[in-house]
Amino acid sequence: MKTAYQHTKKGQSCFLRAGLLMLLVLFCSVSGWAAKQESIKKKEINKSFNVGKNDILQVDNRYGNITVTHWSKSEVSIRVVIEAKARNDEKAQAIIDRVNIRMEKMGNTVSAVTSLRSQNGNGGSNESFTINYYVNMPSELTCDLTQKYGNIIMPENNKGKCDLHVKYGNLNGGNFTGPLSIDVQYGNMDISDVDNATLDLAYCGKSSIRNGSQLNIDSKYSNLSLGNVRKMNTEAKYGDIHIDRLDNGYMELKYGNCKIDELKQGITVDELSYSTLTIKDLASNFDKVNVDARYGNLNIYIDVNASFRVVANNMKYGNCKV
């Protein structure tokens, strides 16, 4: 009986090994079959245009990135790379065929626009595509760039006028010595130094400018970090602002907080509603701090050598402590 029992166990062991081997072979076969289901198709479009100092570049793209680099040529070169992924070559090619890129020069405007033809049926869950623009242009050229569902990446030094629009993506750039207009929604922004900039921010988790000479800011549901700012005009709602150093400013702040580490000259706050403004270091030779606060808090740390007068008019539901 003992020998028969051992023989039966060996038979079961062999059977289990054979079964596991069959499952392993089947798994490898299925994995190999599944891996073959992804097909990748690419298409590249290249065009170049001669430009002068008064020309304008306009790019309107979606589902990808716009990456700009500068060169010394009086020419704009645009390379568009379209990449589609699908279960088979036919479906990947169908995605490529949906994408239309129109590039032309009319008058003094070079334009490149992405459009998508309507899709036949519903796309599969494992289908995707990207449309990436790579632009070479003179640094002094005026540009108007719009990117939806993707990012705009600008070079280190930008000398021309720039209008930059990003929705559902991020904006990254270096220094801007020409007029700059920025519109970012549902994304982040990181800029180095600017001379004159207008910012329209909405639902931006993190936005930053290292240094600014003149800033005009409209911010909603966004957080903004600024370095050294000479002059700023700001309207902010539902978000926080941090400024390292400010010379002079005007502000309306609602349902948010603003912290200024160092204020050199003065600030006028026409409305401080359900918000807190904190000035950590007010220069001893400051000019004026004028704040209209309604259900808000104002905290100012003043140099011990400063000479000043406090005027608190029409105070309700609050205290003034010096």
Segments predicted by a language model, with ranges:
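Bacterial N-terminal signal peptides
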Residues: 18-29
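Short, solvent-exposed loop/turn segments at secondary-structure boundaries
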Residues: 124-126, 281-283, 302
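Beta-strand-rich extracellular passenger or scaffold domains
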Residues: 142, 152-154, 276-279, 298-300
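Eukaryotic tandem repeat interaction scaffolds
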Residues: 222-298
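N-terminal Sec-pathway targeting helices
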Residues: 11-18
